[in-house]
Amino acid sequence: MIVMTYANFKGGVGKTTNSVMTAYELAKKGYKTLVCDLDPQANATQLLRRTYGLQNNQKGLKIGSTMMVALSNENINEAIVKIMDNLYLLPSYSDFTEYPDFLELKYPAIEDNYKEKRIAYFKHQLDKVKDDYDFVIVDVPPTLSIYTDSAVYASNEVIIVLQTQQRSLDGAEAFFEYLQRTYDKYPSINFDILGVLDVLLKNNVGLDSQILNDAGKIFGYDLMFHMIIHHMERLKRYDRTGIADKDLSPSDFHDTKVHYTYLTLTDEILERLRQKGEIE
C-alpha cells in the first residue's frame, strides 16, 4: 500500500481537487484507492459525496460513522464508504476538530515520546487496512498541525502542490523545509517527496513562467512534474455537482479534457513510482 499526501502551507492552491482527481483516475485504472480526508473542513468528503450522488442519481452519500468516531474506536473500517468501483472514502466531519484533544488525552505530556505517539496514531490505524488498498491518498489542511503531522508520518510519498502565485511558492518552500525538519526529527519516519505539481492560476500569463522557473531553482527541476495542471473552469463545477464522467454520468467534452489531464498526471505518478521500485 502506497500512502501519498498532497500538501502546501498555502490554502486554495488546488490540493483537494488534485488529490481527489488523482485518486479517481487511479481507481479507474483498476487500483483500489482510499481517500483519507484529514481536513476538518471536509472538502474532499463533500466532493466525493456529490460524485456518488451524481453517478447514482441520489442527493448524496449517506455516511454512518465519522472518522473521529472510528479513530477513537480504533477501527477506521467502520467509517470507510464506497464511492464507486475501486474508490473509497474515509470521510471527515466537523467533529474531527476534536482529534487534537483526543490525542492529548490518549497520550498526555507526561508520557515518554508523547509527541511522536500522537502523530503516529493515525498511521497505526491505517496500517490495519494496508492489505485492502493499493493506494491511500491523503488530503490535509494548509496548516502546521497535528493533521499534517499525522499524514506525513503515515506517508510513503508527498506531493507538493504549487499554484503559480508568490504566496503559494512561499507556502511550498515553507512546507519543503517543514518536511526536512520532520524527517530529521523522527528516525522511524520514512517518506520521500515524489514531486512538485504545478497548477496554473491563469493560462498564458507571464508571471506563471517566472514562478515555475523559481520553483525549479528552489526544488530542483527534476522534482517538478512534467504535467502542468492548466486552469480549467470545469473543476469549479465539480465542487458543486461532483465529478462528471462519460462512463458513469452525464458529461461533455470539458469533462473529457479534465479526465485526460489527470489521467496523464496519474500515469506520470505511476511511472515515477515504478522507477523507484515501489510498484511493478
Label for each model-derived stretch:
Residues 1-280:
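P-loop NTP-binding core
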